């Protein structure tokens, strides 16, 4: 059994926990969100599904996204512009984001140094980090 099949089984189990069935619509939404482009709004996901001739209502997409978030398949992103974006957590190790306030471009980055500093700060105050969200809002340097 490959990784994709394992994730689909886990998704089916999550749906079962929610007393829902794995329909062709939910399966298409799962594939689109998990294996499609990153950092997309619900509307972009709906548009992509329509282009692929998948008939899923916006309500079904939102409900499925909520389940994907609840069961840790997907991360919900608020980058401060009033629009929520979604990003798969499957196959994407922890990373942070830089968001350009002029263009909206989202740049992913990893810094072991920043991670270590955050852990040291938490420990210094008697805590252990269980999760964090690190977003840098940036502007291009004008030369």
Model-flagged regions — what are they?
Residues 44-50, 61:
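A short acidic, leucine-rich amphipathic alpha-helix
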Residues 22-25:
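Short helix-coil-helix linker/hinge
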Residues 5-19:
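Short, Lys/Arg-enriched N-terminal segment that forms or immediately precedes the first helix
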Residues 36-41:
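Short capping segments at the starts of secondary-structure elements
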Residues 61-71:
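Basic amphipathic alpha-helical segments that dock to polyanions
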Residues 70-143:
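Non-DNA-binding regulatory cores of transcription-related proteins
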């Amino acid at each position: 059994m490959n990784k994709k099949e394992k994730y689909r089984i886990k998704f089916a189990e999550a749906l079962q926990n929610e007393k829902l069935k794995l329909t062709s619509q939910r399966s298409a939404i799962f594939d689109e969100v998990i294996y499609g482009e990153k950092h997309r709004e619900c509307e972009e996901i709906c548009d992509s599904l329509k282009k692929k001739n998948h008939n899923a209502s916006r309500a079904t997409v939102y409900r499925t996204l909520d389940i994907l978030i609840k069961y840790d398949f997907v991360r919900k992103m608020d980058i401060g512009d009033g629009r929520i974006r979604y990003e798969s957590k499957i196959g994407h190790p922890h990373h942070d984001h830089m968001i350009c306030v002029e263009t909206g471009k989202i740049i992913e980055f990893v810094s072991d140094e920043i991670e270590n500093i955050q852990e040291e700060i938490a420990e210094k105050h008697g805590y252990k980090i269980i999760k964090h969200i690190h977003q840098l809002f940036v502007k291009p340097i004008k030369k």
